[in-house]
Curated annotation (Swiss-Prot):
Annotated positions binding ATP: G32, R35, R116, D159, R162, R165, R168
Matching InterPro entries: Bact_CCA-adding_enz_type3_sf, CCA-adding_enz_C, CCA-adding_enz_firmicutes, NT_sf, PolA_pol_head_dom, PolyA_RNA-bd
UniProt-listed SUPFAM superfamilies: Nucleotidyltransferase, Poly A polymerase C-terminal region-like
Identification of the protein by name: CCA-adding enzyme
Key word Nucleotidyltransferase present: yes
HAMAP family in UniProt: CCA_bact_type3
UniProt organism field: Leuconostoc citreum (strain KM20)
Subunit description: Homodimer.
Any Pfam family hit: tRNA_NucTran2_2
Gene (UniProt): cca
Length: 403
């Protein structure tokens, strides 16, 4: 098979391959960029594999960076965008179930391709567009199938993260997982516990955003893989999430965790511990702690609660849509947001300095307490947000405290 017209992303990198070949080495486009081109999907990073060893690549080009030289990868910056060039290699045992104990550089493309995870990722292409498919990846693409290269159990034992990658590709592409590969998922699933949580989380987030996430999660439930994920989530919760994802999927990564935790049978005081078990970012933690309590009782949410999460309202509505909250309820929440007289405490027309300047309070806890009461009074429309009204009301509050 030959691609007659190469996408621009590959044409821009052709001079790199030509230069390597002119020195007597082999060079090919490999990996996800080739796969995505064949699937008519957007192409991201273009990777190159070569028979030249790292030091030979560095001698051929003037601008290089050792991005992963111990594994044979050198970044070449000679032609515009940087391109990662990796030497053909074979790999030894994987004691940590993630990285090979030893990498051996070789001159054979076939040896390099057979160490890869799935057949759809083990396709190479020459600079002129000739496709090299040694493991029937094209057939698997045509039949919409995720199949491991060689023995699936061996592949998953080498790198247990490939279990999550199989599920993720299935969720993104809508491909079925081949029977032998699916059986290996269940057999080797326990090795997920040996993988860094951060790496699992990245794949899991991509999975949930996939158009076919529901089908992929169903496979994970059937293979009993969910028991090896952080947080010990109940099967009933997984089934609820699977049903949600048949209708809609998160369109942005920021929605994932507020949505996900809104569907779990967790008490509010357990949210933070759960998020820590997944090693999420502080921003994700803040979003969850702000949004999930609202979602849990959205029918009775107060104006104060919505005011407190004003900056998260777009995220809140995305979560409410994902879980199928009635439109009437969402409209009521939006009306409360829209009717807020202020959206942040910085919108208040007076500050603590004004209270001090007018000799209404003295520095200390009382000032903060009065400012909070003023803020609440404005939100409830007891008073208007005007300096004269606020100062007058502040005097009343102080007098009431004295009495």
């Amino acid at each position: 098979m030959k691609i007659s017209t190469l996408p621009q992303e590959f044409m821009q990198a052709q001079p790199i391959l030509e230069h390597i070949e002119s020195a007597g080495f082999e060079a090919y486009f490999v990996g996800g960029a080739v796969r995505d081109m064949l699937l008519n999907k957007p192409i991201h990073d273009v990777d190159i594999a070569t028979s030249a060893f790292p030091e030979e690549i560095k001698a051929l080009f003037t601008k290089t960076v050792d991005t992963g030289i111990q594994h044979g990868t050198v970044m070449v910056l000679d032609h515009g965008d940087g391109y990662e060039i990796t030497t053909f290699r074979t790999e030894s045992t994987y004691t940590d179930f993630r990285r090979p104990d030893k990498v051996t550089f070789v001159r054979s493309l076939a040896e390099d391709l057979k160490r890869r995870d799935f057949t759809i990722n083990a396709i190479a292409m020459t600079k002129d567009g000739d496709i090299i498919d040694l493991f029937d990846g094209l057939t698997d693409m045509a039949q919409k199938r995720i199949r491991a290269v060689g023995d699936a159990e061996v592949r998953f034992n080498e790198d247990a993260l490939r279990i999550m990658r199989a599920l993720r590709f299935s969720a993104q592409l809508g491909f079925d997982i081949a029977p032998h590969t699916k059986a290996a998922l269940k057999q080797i699933g326990r090795n997920l516990e040996k993988i860094a949580v951060e790496r699992i989380r990245v794949e899991f987030e991509k999975l949930l955003m996939g158009q076919y996430a529901s089908n992929s999660l169903s496979v994970a439930i059937e293979a009993d893989l969910i028991r090896y994920l952080p947080g010990h989530i109940k099967k009933e919760d997984w089934l609820t999430i699977t049903a949600d994802l048949k209708r809609n999927q998160p369109q942005a990564r920021t929605v994932i965790w507020p949505y996900f935790l809104s569907r779990l049978s967790l008490r509010l005081n357990e949210l933070q511990l759960f998020m820590r078990s997944w090693k999420t970012s502080r921003e994700d933690m803040r979003a969850v702690l702000s949004i999930v309590p609202i979602v849990k009782h959205v029918q009775t949410v107060s104006v104060f609660e919505l005011y407190a999460i004003y900056d998260y309202q777009a995220l809140l509505f995305e979560v409410l849509t994902l879980i199928g909250t009635p439109l009437a309820t969402q409209q009521r929440v939006k009306q409360i947001f829209d009717a807020l007289p202020i959206t942040h405490n910085r919108d208040m027309c007076i500050s603590g300095g004004d209270l001090l300047a007018n000799n209404i309070v003295t520095p200390g806890p009382q000032m903060g307490r009065i400012l909070t009461q003023l803020e609440h009074a404005v939100i409830q429309r007891i008073i208007s947000n005007r300096p004269d009204s606020l100062l007058e009301y502040a005097k009343e509050l102080v007098d009431n405290e004295k009495n």
